[in-house]
Curated annotation (Swiss-Prot):
<keyword id="KW-0677">Repeat</keyword>
<feature type="disulfide bond">
    <location>
        <begin position="773"/>
        <end position="810"/>
    </location>
</feature>
<feature type="domain" description="Disintegrin">
    <location>
        <begin position="431"/>
        <end position="529"/>
    </location>
</feature>
<feature type="disulfide bond">
    <location>
        <begin position="942"/>
        <end position="947"/>
    </location>
</feature>
<feature type="domain" description="TSP type-1 6">
    <location>
        <begin position="966"/>
        <end position="1015"/>
    </location>
</feature>
<keyword id="KW-0732">Signal</keyword>
<feature type="glycosylation site" description="N-linked (GlcNAc...) asparagine">
    <location>
        <position position="70"/>
    </location>
</feature>
<keyword id="KW-0862">Zinc</keyword>
<feature type="disulfide bond">
    <location>
        <begin position="784"/>
        <end position="795"/>
    </location>
</feature>
<keyword id="KW-0964">Secreted</keyword>
<feature type="domain" description="TSP type-1 1">
    <location>
        <begin position="702"/>
        <end position="751"/>
    </location>
</feature>
<dbReference type="GO" id="GO:0046872">
    <property type="term" value="F:metal ion binding"/>
</dbReference>
<feature type="disulfide bond">
    <location>
        <begin position="718"/>
        <end position="750"/>
    </location>
</feature>
<feature type="disulfide bond">
    <location>
        <begin position="890"/>
        <end position="895"/>
    </location>
</feature>
<keyword id="KW-0479">Metal-binding</keyword>
<feature type="disulfide bond">
    <location>
        <begin position="376"/>
        <end position="396"/>
    </location>
</feature>
<dbReference type="GO" id="GO:0031012">
    <property type="term" value="C:extracellular matrix"/>
</dbReference>
């Protein structure tokens, strides 16, 4: 039976009469804006709710923007909250309260229609939520209570407003703090921060099970203070309702038809920080600097002793920013962070209802979604700018999402398919929480592993109902904790009720004991740990060669984590899904170097994406082992000499050389193992299968086609064009069928176009200043467009403008001390360097703590230059004072000083012994080369006394000549930066010898460079 609360009809009217009375807080609460000028187009409505007899909302009706909405609603609390959710409130003394979600109301609902989707909450009798209708987001929100009397037609439900989510006047377009530039510096400092590009071709995603994000929600002190000042004693309840309302609206966005597969968010921990922990203190992140606060929060949630969630989100009361004077962003997350304990974290402002849209976007980043631009239109959820109609997921987002899930499944570590939750028993009606979770378990849930109840004296045991104490050990630090849960043992035949220790009545309840009590019967499923299947067969006739110089042929076997799949919190399989047996050391038909292969791929990406930033070239990043088997494409350098890259998800072919006796397999660089016969990861044993290794051409083997690539963009938007796709053969030239495929597209007639010739688009907004304070630079951009509004490349002038900017003097936080004095010149004659330092009085400081400048004390009398010292030789004696030496080389002539030096070593007295006893020689090492003159070595140890003779021995090996017919140089690498910023300097480049044998010529090349004449007046 339905009970309609209003019979008066569906009412709507303009609410402008209210607005003059709204202060800044009212505007923020209702519309998420700061000024009256930013208020979007809106209407006042009187929604009509219908309730079941049990009090749950069943249906909602209202009229908005000349359309009637009739929403049938389903409750969602059971989906939003785990049955074992832990609710924690911490105060400044690390105490607080602990609960299991019993106080959370079921006041959140979803509507699923053919074209209309909605997330509605009515926790305080007022309607709040979003309706997604035909590409638009309509927000329903109550007016502030203290303005309700201004409505002449207000009902008992209170006055409500409805408005469309759109770009507001003055609202910053770039609300997201994620930076997706890949620089050479970021590769060096943090390889895990590489941001991959979109349009990655992968296999169709296999939906093995539901995808559930077990979520930990944290609320910081600033947001708690905001709710506390506004709601007083109701702050806890209001904050919980508000948080779940946000998540309810985020959830509906991930349940849309365009989100495939759907993603379910389930809260397993909700923690309010009424006092900010020291690790998150404001001065550590410049009071809301987005990147700094996110970094601190990621470390904080990772280091918590209690951690059983897939992702952590912090709702903050800070107006987060990029730096001094910048308040343009509202959220930030780690790209690809989901399931990575150090990076599975999101920071979002929580002061108004727009947090639901920000959270949706940022959580998308965590599951691999990049910004849509420039490859998809700016009209979807993952657009880098706010705007109307951004309620669906783009093709770019779904490709990123699917590829991310495939990577997780491929590693066997997809946390979204298994639960991290420990086996928590549900609390039945006749068992109280304190009987299921005894005092020790309560301490552990509140503070983490290792914490237990500090047992009080027997005469004061009943005090735990008011305040229970927890500590790490009998000698550890004691922490003021929380009142014990209802039903906790507090003395013989006593338990806690309403904060007091009272006798157990024995009526319909299980008697409390000091021991942990659990129901005998439980519906918890048993834990199933994942286990590897057997290896697939190694088929030597399918030996694959990739046509790249220096590669080897491989026969690959695979396995899956399916015997059984992990379930119910069971652990994943550990290790790799692939291994390979060597079947050819010298693949025939090799026609290109690794860098040539990479450049071909990068040119293909440049053509497919029509991206002028790509140079069409790339090179292997051998200095980063984790990236040596990935295809990185160079991006044009606009400033300085730092190289930038983009990664499009391509791996180098299996068998490609990635170092000395190291080769690629599934994008990983692995060393030859198992007597140089196999590529296996660290956890695997050597395969029993072997293949006859051949050095002949691989043309005797049949190749296999890979999957088709994505279709290219159509060559025309109308009037008939064509598009292409291609596929690769595992053995070049050994597959039947065509490598390329072409089809007609955009065959419809073109409309008449008045514009003639290409023209520039309007300039973008100036981007953010390069520094947070002081003087820096900023840029803006524009695109060259054809009459059909597609990208063109022949517009006159430049597509970028740069200007200086000044963010004002730097604030007191992060002030540099004065510079110290200059050091002495690093050389006594010729070019050298002076260095001086300064100290940051308080972090963070912009700029460098070191400054260098050139010096030249005197002209050297000769042109000789010493090399660096070699390593010290081994000591001549193991005890009793020996000697060791080192040497250096003179480049040129007339170097001043000695070419060698000695020093004493092992000066300790020798143990008394009548015999000097050598141990046996070790076995000979492998020869240092496979052909040509090499060296092998062996060693022995002096067991007693001071043994005469050497402890190591060398011998010549492999003195046969190398065959040079297959040795060939790869292309030269890039020139290094000039060693001097002005005056004469040196730059270098290097190339690699591929194949067997030695290449003729030099591996390294250097040349002099002179960027500009030094201005000594300015320099000194």
């Amino acid at each position: 039976m339905l009970l309609p609360l209003l019979i008066s009809g569906l009412l709507f009217r303009n609410a402008d009469a209210f607005l003059p009375f709204f202060n800044e807080d009212d505007l923020k609460y209702t519309f998420g804006v700061d000024t009256h000028a930013e208020v979007p187009n809106h209407e006042e409505i009187d929604p009509v709710p219908y309730y079941h007899q049990n009090g749950s909302l069943h249906k909602l009706e209202f009229m908005a923007f000349n359309k009637k909405y009739n929403l049938s609603l389903e409750p969602t609390l059971a989906k939003l909250l785990s049955s074992g959710v832990t609710v924690v409130k911490k105060n400044e003394k690390k105490g607080g309260s602990l609960d299991f979600g019993s106080t959370l109301d079921s006041c959140h609902y979803h509507h699923y229609g053919e074209k209309v989707y909605a997330a509605i909450s009515n926790c305080d009798g007022r309607i709040k939520g979003t309706v997604i209708d035909d590409g638009e987001i309509i927000v329903v929100h109550p007016f502030p209570d203290h303005h309700a009397h201004r409505s002449k037609r207000a009902t008992e439900n209170g006055a409500h407003v409805v408005y469309k989510r759109e770009t507001l006047a003055g609202e910053p377009k770039d609300f997201c703090g994620l930076d997706n530039v890949v620089t050479e510096e970021s590769l060096v400092e943090d390889e895990s921060a590489i941001f991959e590009d979109v349009f990655v071709t992968g296999q169709r995603l296999t939906q093995q099970s539901d995808l559930i994000v077990e979520l930990a929600v944290f609320v910081d002190e600033n947001l708690w203070r905001h709710f506390s000042s506004k709601h007083g004693g109701m702050a806890d309840r209001k904050l919980q309702d508000y948080t779940l309302t946000l998540l309810n609206n985020i959830q509906i966005m991930y349940y849309q038809p365009t989100a495939s597969p759907p993603l379910t968010f389930r809260v397993i921990r909700y923690e309010v920080l009424t006092r900010q922990p020291s690790a998150l203190a404001g001065y550590l992140h410049n009071h809301g600097n987005a990147q700094m606060y996110l970094d601190r929060f990621c470390r904080y949630q990772r280091n918590l002793a209690v951690r059983d969630w897939d992702h952590a989100i912090m709702l903050t009361g800070y107006d987060i920013h990029r730096g001094a004077g910048s308040r343009s962003i509202s959220g930030i997350a780690r790209l690809d962070g989901m399931c990575d304990p150090w990076n599975t974290c999101t920071l979002a402002e929580g002061l108004d209802f727009t947090s639901a849209f920000i959270g949706t976007h940022e959580l998308g980043h965590s599951v691999g979604m990049r910004h849509d631009e420039p490859y998809c239109q700016s009209k979807h959820i993952m657009s880098s700018s706010l705007g109307p109609g951004k309620v669906t997921w783009s093709t770019c987002s779904l490709r990123d999402y699917h590829q991310f899930l495939q990577r997780l499944d491929g590693r066997g570590k997809n946390c979204l398919r298994v639960s991290n939750m420990p086996n928590k028993l549900e609390i039945s009606s006749n068992v109280k929480p304190g009987q299921i979770y005894d005092a020790n378990l309560q301490c552990e849930l509140m503070h983490g592993n290792g914490y237990q109840q500090v047992t009080p004296r027997q005469d004061s045991y009943d005090g735990i109902c008011y305040m229970m104490w927890c500590g790490q050990s009998s000698f550890g630090r004691i922490i003021t904790s929380h009142p014990a849960l209802e039903g906790t043992f507090c003395g013989p035949s006593k338990w806690c009720q309403l904060g007091r220790c009272v006798p157990w009545t024995g009526t319909n309840e299980i008697q409390p004991t000091v021991q942990h009590v659990a129901p005998v019967v439980t519906t918890l499923p048993s834990r199933i740990d994942g286990s590897w299947s057997g290896w697939g067969a190694t088929i030597c006739s399918q030996c694959t060669c990739n046509g790249i110089l220096g590669s080897v042929g491989l026969a690959i076997a695979r396995r899956t984590c399916s015997a059984p799949y992990p379930a119910n919190g069971g652990s994943d399989c550990v290790g790799s899904t692939s291994r390979a047996v060597l079947c050819s050391r010298q693949c025939g038909r090799a026609s290109k170097s690794v860098d040539e292969y990479i450049s071909d791929k990068c040119m293909e990406q440049k053509r497919l994406k029509n991206d002028r930033e790509l140079t069409g070239k790339g090179s292997q990043l051998n200095r980063f082992p984790q990236r040596a088997c990935k295809v990185f494409c160079d991006v044009q350098q606009h400033y300085g000499s730092q190289r930038n890259y983009r990664f499009f998800g391509d791996n180098l072919p299996d068998g490609t050389s990635c170092g000395y006796d190291r080769y690629c397999l599934d994008g990983e660089c692995l060393a030859l193992n198992c007597n140089n016969n196999a590529l296996i990861s660290r956890d695997q044993s050597c395969p029993t299968d072997t293949c006859p290794i051949t050095d002949q051409s691989s043309s005797v083997y049949r190749g296999q086609w890979g999957t088709w690539s994505l279709w290219t963009s159509c060559t025309a938007t109308c009037g008939g064009g064509y598009r292409k796709r291609n596929r690769a053969c595992s053995i070049t030239g050994q597959c039947e069928g065509n490598e390329d495929e072409t089809e007609v597209c955009s065959s419809e007639s073109c409309p008449s176009v008045l514009r003639v010739g290409n023209e520039w688009s309007t300039w973008t907004e100036w981007n953010h200043c390069s520094v947070s304070c002081g003087r820096g630079s900023q840029a803006r951009y524009r695109k060259c467009l054809s009459p059909h509004r597609t990208l063109a490349f022949d517009c006159p002038e430049k597509n970028i403008e740069v200007r200086s900017c000044d963010n004002g003097p730097c604030n007191a936080i992060g002030v540099w001390g004065t510079w110290g004095g200059w050091s002495t010149c690093s050389t006594s004659c010729g070019p050298g360097t002076l260095v001086r330092q300064r100290t940051c009085n308080r972090e963070p400081c912009d700029g460098s703590a070191h400054e260098r400048r050139s010096c030249n004390v005197a002209t050297c009398q000769n042109d000789g230059i010493w090399s660096l010292w070699n390593e010290w030789s081994d000591c001549s004696r193991v005890c009793g004072k020996g000697l060791r030496s080192r040497s250096r080389s003179c480049f040129g002539s007339g170097c001043m000083g000695a070419s060698s030096e000695q020093q004493f070593c092992n000066e300790q007295a020798c143990a008394s012994s009548s015999a000097n006893d050598w141990g046996t020689w070790s076995g000979w090492s492998q020869c240092s080369v496979s052909c040509g003159a090499g060296v092998k070595r062996r060693t022995r140890t002096c067991r007693t006394g001071n043994c005469p003779g050497n402890y190591k021995e060398s011998a010549i090996c492999n003195d046969r000549d190398c065959e040079n017919k297959n040795a060939a140089w790869g292309g030269w690498g890039y020139w290094s930066s000039c060693s001097e910023t002005c005056g004469d300097g040196v730059r270098k480049r290097v190339r690699k010898c591929y194949g067997s044998g030695n290449c003729d010529g030099q591996q390294y090349e250097k040349q002099y460079c002179n960027l500009r004449v030094c201005d000594f007046r300015r320099k000194f």
